[in-house]
Swiss-Prot record:
Entry-linked PANTHER family: ENERGY-COUPLING FACTOR TRANSPORTER ATP-BINDING PROTEIN ECFA1, HEAVY METAL TRANSPORTER
Name of protein: Energy-coupling factor transporter ATP-binding protein EcfA1
GO CC, any one term: ATP-binding cassette (ABC) transporter complex
Organism: Bacillus cereus (strain ZK / E33L)
Assembly information from the UniProt record: Forms a stable energy-coupling factor (ECF) transporter complex composed of 2 membrane-embedded substrate-binding proteins (S component), 2 ATP-binding proteins (A component) and 2 transmembrane proteins (T component).
An example molecular function term from Gene Ontology annotations: ATPase-coupled transmembrane transporter activity
Pfam family, one: ABC_tran
Length: 280
């Protein structure tokens, strides 16, 4: 059985002066080597959840437990932050070094890591995100996707238990988004890294292992992507779209082209259409 890395139990939070709760009675677990996406329209509570998990705010009720032992509180917040690494949406705002290597080792220098160990962590982190050939490049010379991969490397160098992506692909072009999503999938599959992705991009969420839908501060639904995106009517009712491949598949079914599976990518959909055509 996989080890539980993060658990929220009945957490609630209300901003001062607000009439309603931003989060209400939210409970879920995150397991080792799992990629979970949290989706929801604006105002659903996604950003508030990210702030709570990183200890920027503390829940008014309920608990957040990391690695099955550490409960988030004012006393433990700095220890929790060592276990949870965050990558934010604007890659340009995350660079603090003049080169890729300067940026990745910045956090390591701050904790006084010996140089030999720091170089080892630097090279390992850049290899994980396939940016080892850009060691001495300046940030302005990189694409958006490359910048986010360097930001991920900077977090991985600190070896947190959990990687949280807070709208990390929202400001990227399609190619940049693909680069980041492919990197995340590789980190999960090959290295067993645990990822929580807070996103409005349903194409990205469709690639994860599990999806949590937040609506008005509460968990509306939770399940594997195939299960979640079957309920396209429910998603549209709360202001969310569905992946393009799901839309196309639904149109085909209305035209009596019966498909066996829920297709979360165009590649998967095209492959089944090709098989159907080959049988004729």
């Amino acid at each position: 059985m996989k080890k539980e890395k993060l658990r929220t139990e009945n957490i609630s939070f209300q901003y001062p002066g607000a009439a309603t709760y931003a989060l209400k009675d939210v409970s879920f677990s995150l397991f080792e080597g799992e990629w979970v996406s949290v989706i929801g329209q604006n105002g659903s509570g996604k950003s508030t959840l990210a702030k709570l998990l990183n200890g920027l705010f503390l829940p008014e009720a309920g608990t957040i437990t990391v690695n099955d032992t550490m409960i988030l509180s004012e006393e433990t917040v700095w220890d929790v932050r060592k276990q949870i690494g965050m990558v934010f949406q604007n890659p340009d705002n995350q660079f603090v070094g003049t080169t890729v290597q300067d940026d990745v080792v910045f956090g390591l220098e701050n904790i006084g890591m010996p140089r030999e160990q720091m170089v080892e962590r630097l090279n390992q982190a850049l290899r994980l995100v396939r940016m080892e050939d850009f060691l001495n490049d300046e940030p302005h010379s990189l694409s958006g996707g490359q910048k986010q991969r360097v930001a991920i490397a900077g977090v991985l160098a600190l070896q947190p238990s959990i990687l949280i992506l807070d709208e990390a692909t929202s400001m990227l072009d399609p190619q940049g988004r693909r680069e980041v999503v492919e990197t995340v999938r590789q980190l999960v599959n090959e290295k067993g890294i645990t990822v929580l992705s807070i996103t409005h991009d349903l194409e990205e969420a469709a690639q994860s292992d599990r999806v949590i839908i937040l609506n008005k501060g509460e968990i509306l639904e939770e399940g594997i992507p195939e299960q979640i995106f079957k309920s396209s009517h429910m998603l549209q009712e709360i202001g969310l779209d569905v992946p393009f491949s799901v839309k196309i598949a639904e149109l085909l079914k209305r035209n009596e082209i019966l498909l066996q599976n829920t297709h979360l990518t165009m590649e998967s959909l095209v492959n089944e259409l090709w098989r159907l055509h080959s049988k004729k």
